[in-house]
Amino acid sequence: MKDSFKNSWAIYRRLLGYLLGYWKVLLLSMLSMAVAALTEPAVAKLLKPLIDGGFVNKDPQVIMWVPLAIIGIYLIRGLAGFINEYTASWLTGQLVQRLRQQMFAKLVNLPARYYDEHQSGRLMSRITNDVNQVTEAGFNVITVTVRDGLTALGMLGLMLTTDWQLTLICLVVMPAVTYCMRLVGQRLRGLARQNQQHMAQMTQVLAESIQCQRAIKVYGGQEREMARFDHTATSVRRNQVKQSAASAANTGVTQLMIACALAAILYFAGLRAQHGGLTAGDFMVFLTAMLGLFAPVKRISSVSQAMQRGLAAAESVFAFIDEPGEPDDGASALPATRGRLSFDAVSFAYPNVDSPALSGIDLEIQPGETVALVGSSGSGKTTLASLVPRFYEPSAGRLLLDGVPLADIPLRQLRGHIALVSQQVELFNDTVAANIAYGREDASREEIVEAARAANAMEFIEGLPDGLETVIGENGARLSGGQRQRLAIARALLKNAPLLILDEATSALDTQSERLVQAALENLMKNRTTIVIAHRLSTIENADRIVVMHQGRLAEQGRHQALLEQGGLYARLHSLQFSEPQAD
């Protein structure tokens, strides 16, 4: 219990830190809340002169000035309420924006391993759903606490000055209400955590159903996906019912205690009135203050529910923000890169996988050399290439560029020397030109066109409705597979980096396009260090060196003809591939 309180306070204190950056607006909001809150006991206080002076003593002056005073108080209350609502909305917007900006900045700087271990649906849910719930634990809770807290204190003070004995009866129920709030609040926080998990699972199913909609249709997976969605939606519904039940229990218990207090107070007030200790005006003031006290106390008691939900969401948000980013401690500048890559006893293992993906790799790639990595699926080709831009860090050994360890080179500078074209093309919902020039915003129109021509892409670009300014849809959904691949190649051509990684770069092209693009790639690879990952061995026969990988190790290396003559693993792969019947 004590550790939980400390953790909650630490989370809440961190949230307040975001708001303190706007302390002037926060102060104005607090002052307007205080003014609006104190108008309620002020109105209740006016009932005594109105009842005793106006109705009992028939004083005409009282009947005139009390209504005017009430109008003035409500004018002040309306202005203060407007200022409070506006500043609260502004502060809430700032809080949400800053959290989302920090989360997105973390998102784009997380290591590749994090994405391997976490579902995309949960990541999206954190940035959208969780951040919205954080505002409940941020400014919304402050608003209710300050506004209703001051109202409650004002009403309580008015009750004490009117009749302290009756006030003591009201205070008897408060410890019991607080105790019940704490018990139910703990339950609500646990249910809020579960709800976030269920919502993330439902978001994941939705995301996969949208991304894989063609596979779902072709393989008849509609019923399976509907069953998955029904399961997650049912979990969300059941959890929300539990939350509603716990919330209703909290509200019901609070209201029952308030009703008991009200009955007791009315009874004792009647006794005091019989003995002349309470005037009609006093009773109306006390009754109005007491009834006015219950509403803010009820809201304060229910604010614990919002706080528990918000704290659970804030815990998730801050855990994401605090995730360690990619290691980037390098300080060695590389003014000019020759492109010599060295793998020195490099090993790598994925988390929770028994066998290593790479074991003791020793490989030297000379400047301007084209090295092809071949092997069966799972042999470690893509993993080895992924170590070059430091998507992953080796478990043992080290990689060097021109004799400088990659870990000593700043990530931005290292990746500035690398161009990548992979089998899984990644495009943005933007224009053709913007996708080609991604990372080269300073590129001229002529450079973009030249890169597109070299990648054999201009022929289809010119046929698009708006040419280079055509928006291609999410991940290039409006283009064919071959067209998307050629845009990715054009992007690599435009970057003109000294290091190239081509991961099945021509796999999505038809035969005619493959020949043209292969010729463009061969021109690009001249005098550049290139790592080519290929399944079709026909595309890498002219490589300077072919490295054959098997179960995470280097099995063979050499030129195409020499490896065939050895009759080893490469020769068997070549024989197997070229003995397969060719598709029409």
UniProtKB/Swiss-Prot annotation:
> Which family is this protein grouped under?
Belongs to the ABC transporter superfamily. Lipid exporter (TC 3.A.1.106) family.
What GO molecular function annotations does the UniProt record carry, in alphabetical order? Answer: ABC-type oligopeptide transporter activity; ATP binding; ATP hydrolysis activity; ATPase-coupled lipid transmembrane transporter activity
Q: What is known of its domains?
A: In MsbA the ATP-binding domain (NBD) and the transmembrane domain (TMD) are fused.
Which PANTHER family does this UniProt record tie to the protein? ATP-BINDING CASSETTE SUB-FAMILY B MEMBER 10, MITOCHONDRIAL (PTHR43394:SF1), ATP-DEPENDENT PERMEASE MDL1, MITOCHONDRIAL (PTHR43394)
From the UniProt record, list the reaction(s) this protein catalyses.
ATP + H2O + lipid A-core oligosaccharideSide 1 = ADP + phosphate + lipid A-core oligosaccharideSide 2
Q: Where in the cell is it found?
A: Cell inner membrane
Recorded GO CC terms = plasma membrane
Function in brief = Involved in lipopolysaccharide (LPS) biosynthesis. Translocates lipid A-core from the inner to the outer leaflet of the inner membrane. Transmembrane domains (TMD) form a pore in the inner membrane and the ATP-binding domain (NBD) is responsible for energy generation.
Subunit comment for this entry?
Homodimer.
Residues spanning the membrane: 15-35, 63-83, 153-173, 251-271, 277-297
Q: Which InterPro entries match?
A: AAA+_ATPase, ABC1_TM_dom, ABC1_TM_sf, ABC_transporter-like_ATP-bd, ABC_transporter-like_CS, ABC_transpr_lipidA, P-loop_NTPase, Type_1_exporter
The cross-references to PROSITE patterns, in alphabetical order and at most eight, read: ABC_TM1F, ABC_TRANSPORTER_1, ABC_TRANSPORTER_2, MSBA
> So what EC number does this one have?
7.5.2.6
- Top EC class of this enzyme: translocase
Q: Name one Pfam family in it.
A: ABC_membrane
UniProt domain ABC transporter: residue ranges = 341-576
Name of the gene: msbA
- Please report the name of this protein according to its UniProt entry: ATP-dependent lipid A-core flippase
Keyword terms of this UniProt record: ATP-binding, Cell inner membrane, Cell membrane, Lipid transport, Membrane, Nucleotide-binding, Translocase, Transmembrane, Transmembrane helix, Transport
Which residues hold ATP? Answer: G375, S376, S377, G378, S379, G380, K381, T382
Q: Which residues form the ABC transmembrane type-1 domain?
A: 27-309
Q: How does it sit in the membrane?
A: Multi-pass membrane protein
